[in-house]
Amino acid sequence: MQVTQTLNEGLKRGYTITLTGAELDAKVTEKLIEVQPEVEIKGFRKGKVPMAMLRKNFGDRVLGDVLNESVDGAIKDLLDQSGDRPALQPKVEMENGKDWKPGTDAIFTVSYEALPPIPAFDRATVTLERLVVKADEASVTEALENLAKSAQAFEDRKKGTKAKDGDQVVIDFEGFLGDEPFEGGKGEEYPLVLGSNSFIPGFEDQLVGAKAGEDVEVKVTFPAEYGAAHLAGKEATFKCHVHAVKAPKPAEIDDELAKKFGAADLEALKGQVASRLEAEYKGASRAILKRALLDILDAQVKFDLPPSLVEAEAGQIAHQLWHEENPDHHGHDHGAVEPTEEHKTLAERRVRLGLLLAELGRNEKIEVTDAEMTQAVLAAARQYPGHEREFFEFVKGNAQMQQQIRAPLYEEKVIDFIVAGAAVTEKEVSKEELQKAIEALDEL
């Protein structure tokens, strides 16, 4: 075997691997000798099949195995010797594949992009600010009022009172396209809160001012993107009968409300609300801190990036954004989506930070434990109520899905490691200031 380097330019590497016909033949013979004692062919006793017969029956298959093993072994050796870590799976091609015949030399070309050397990074040089928001009494009261509103009841208004925004009207309705009723357009004694936007745009507005006992004809146009194709973009008339007009009555903020939400009493509910608010504030604060840290890393640590990784990431970004802009197109049967310069710039940032965090985690021997993975999978499974076990088994047998779950866990652990060694100061702010800081993240 002869291995010759043909390219060493930046991060690009190229090699030629030559396997002589003689060494391939010798390895085939060696493998056939190994299996000969176990081979049994009609007309020959077990272990007594002649080598010529073995070659005739199994030679091509064994030769294929020898070629694969030899090339894989050569690549492993050259990577061990060079210290290279390929950014993607090395590309292997048989140079004389179409014309190659057993017994002659087999020549393979191997090409890949190596991961770049990552500069050392000292987390102690990082200065960060953590925003702190306390769940004060006003915030807890506001949250309790929202809970009370969500638990509100409705009481009949005085007979003859006109319905207004926020009221609940109890209606029968039937929808028509022209003079023909359409399937799924009928309901009886349906409680509809005006202003909730739970019906087709314009429907609820036309019931404002209605009184109990009245018949109201509502005319609407279904949105062009409406889910039912036979209704999308069509004008329709709904004949409605109003049974009742009811006024909202917020629940009292008391022990009874607390029990509705699983708390022993009002004081216990206040404690739960305060804890939930503080958890939300901490989550938002961490997102801001993490963005600041990643900005620092992106600005301070520079190194060459494998073009193949940047190209793949830019393509993924462009594809994802295209689908976000075209939500009704769920398949991949669309034309090519070309990445823009903005996509490429974002891809460079993601690749740089991904490689940097991965290298730091590798050097510090940071790992995601089995227990952490199990918790993450269980959390993801809750998105599929009633099918948690099936989801768990699916993940268990799918390495790609496991990596999708493990990757963000790993990143967060590396971020935690950096923050733990950085100079972090705390700044107390209001929840409004925290909200503005969160909104600013989306603008960047």
UniProtKB/Swiss-Prot annotation:
- Enzyme Commission number: 5.2.1.8
Q: Which Pfam families match?
A: FKBP_C (PF00254), Trigger_C (PF05698), Trigger_N (PF05697)
Ranges for domain PPIase FKBP-type: 166-251
Q: Name one GO cellular component term.
A: cytoplasm
Record keywords, A-Z = Cell cycle, Cell division, Chaperone, Cytoplasm, Isomerase, Rotamase
Gene Ontology terms, MF aspect: peptidyl-prolyl cis-trans isomerase activity; protein folding chaperone; ribosome binding
* InterPro entries associated with the record: PPIase_dom_sf, PPIase_FKBP_dom, Trig_fac, Trigger_fac_C, Trigger_fac_C_sf, Trigger_fac_ribosome-bd_bac, Trigger_fac_ribosome-bd_sf, Trigger_fact/SurA_dom_sf
| Subcellular location, record wording | Cytoplasm
- Any one Gene Ontology BP term: cell division
Extract the Gene3D superfamilies matched here. 3.10.50.40, Trigger factor ribosome-binding domain, Trigger factor, C-terminal domain
Which reaction is recorded as catalysed by this protein? [protein]-peptidylproline (omega=180) = [protein]-peptidylproline (omega=0)
Family to which this protein belongs: Belongs to the FKBP-type PPIase family. Tig subfamily.
Purpose: Involved in protein export. Acts as a chaperone by maintaining the newly synthesized protein in an open conformation. Functions as a peptidyl-prolyl cis-trans isomerase.
Q: How does the record comment on the protein's domains?
A: Consists of 3 domains; the N-terminus binds the ribosome, the middle domain has PPIase activity, while the C-terminus has intrinsic chaperone activity on its own.
The protein's matches in NCBIfam families, at most eight in alphabetical order, are given as:
tig (TIGR00115)
- HAMAP family associated with the record: Trigger_factor_Tig (MF_00303)
| Name of the protein this chain belongs to | Trigger factor
Q: Which organism is it from?
A: Rhodobacter capsulatus (strain ATCC BAA-309 / NBRC 16581 / SB1003)
Q: Which gene encodes it?
A: tig
